[in-house]
Amino acid sequence: MSEVKVGKNESLDSALKRFKRSCQKAGVLQDIRKHEHYEKPSIKKKKKSEAARKKKRF
C-alpha cells in the first residue's frame, strides 16, 4: 500500500502527484487491472507463451 505524508508547506496537488507516482512504481494499478476478471490457468499459460514468443522474435 502506498502512503504519502503531506508536509506543512506542501500543496495538495504535489502530494497527489507523489502518491500517483508511488502507486505507479509499486504497480498497484497494473495489479488491479490484472485481477479485475478471473482468468483460467490454461488461458494464463497461453498468454504467457505468446508473450515469450513475441519477445523472442524481436
UniProtKB/Swiss-Prot annotation:
Keywords per UniProt: Ribonucleoprotein, Ribosomal protein
Gene Ontology, cellular component aspect: ribonucleoprotein complex; ribosome
Basic residues compositional bias, start-end: 43-58
GO molecular function, one term: structural constituent of ribosome
Stretch list, region Disordered: 28-58
GO BP field: translation
Compositionally biased residues, Basic and acidic residues: 31-42
Signal sequence bounds: none
NCBIfam families according to UniProt: S21p (TIGR00030)
Membership in a protein family: Belongs to the bacterial ribosomal protein bS21 family.
Name of the protein this chain belongs to: Small ribosomal subunit protein bS21
Gene coding for it: rpsU
